[in-house]
Amino acid sequence: LLVTLNKGDYVMAGVNHNSHGAQVIFPDDPQFEGMPKNADDRRFMVMPAYLGGKYQMAGMKWYGSNCENKASGLPRSILMMMLNDKDTGAPLALMSANLVSCYRTGAIPGVGAKYLARKDSETVTIIGPGVMGRTCLLAFLSVCPKITTVKVKGRGQRSLHAFEEFVKKECPQIQQVIVCDSMEEAVKDSDIICVTSTAPVKEISHISQKTGSKKVHSSVCHRLHGLMMIF
C-alpha cells in the first residue's frame, strides 16, 4: 500500500487529485427548523479516492461526528466505507469503518515512530485514552520494542480505567502505566508524545520536553486539512 502511494498511483478528491475530502459544517445560527447547529466536532465528511497497484479499487469513507453522541452511548464518530468497481461504478461492499479507521489512524503515527523516534525509546505518553489512543499505542509498541512505560492523561476515570485494562490485556511488554494529573507530568521525560484528544496543541508546546522526543498529533486532522503532525 505505501509503495503504491509513494509511486503516486492513486487519485483523491479535488482539482489537484490530493484533497483529503469535503466537510459539511453547520452554521452557528441556523435559520431553518431542524437544521443542526455548529458545535465542537459536529460535522459530516466524505473522503473519496481511487487506489491503483494491485488494488484497482475506488471507494470512499463517509462519517458523521458529534461529541454529544457519548450521552447516547455512541462513539463520537460513526463511519461507513463504500467500495466500488473502478470501471462500472457498481458497489462491491458497504461496511462499518470505525475499526478500520481507528487502526489506520494508529498505523500512521506508528510509521512515523519507526523512522523518527529514538531507537531506545522506553516511555510513551498517550493524551486521550480512547480507541485512537489504543491503536496508536499498539503501533508504537510494534516498532519500538524497548517501550516499557505508558503515561496517560485523560478527562474521565471511566476512560482511564478502560485504557489501563486494555494495556494489561493487550500489551504484555508494558511494565508500568502511569495516570497523570497534569500535562506537565504526562509530557515530562517521555520519548514519544501522542495527542489523540481534541486538546489544543498549545497545551503542550510550552512544556519542557525530553531532547529527541517525538510528538504526534493524531486528532487535529479536521483542523489542518488532514495533515498528520509528526515532528
Predicted regions and their residues:
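Short acidic low-complexity segments
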Residues: 174-190, 205-207
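Short helix-loop-beta connector
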Residues: 116-123, 146-147
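Rossmann-fold NAD(P)-binding glycine/threonine-rich loop
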Residues: 216-231
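NAD(P)-binding Rossmann-fold cofactor-contacting core
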Residues: 143-170
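Short glycine-/small-residue-rich Rossmann-like dinucleotide-binding loops
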Residues: 197-199, 222-223
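N-terminal ligand-binding/catalytic initiation module
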Residues: 1-102, 108-110, 120
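Glycine-rich Rossmann-fold phosphate-binding loop(s) that bind the pyrophosphate
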Residues: 129-130
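Rossmann-fold NAD(P) dinucleotide-binding segment
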Residues: 200-217
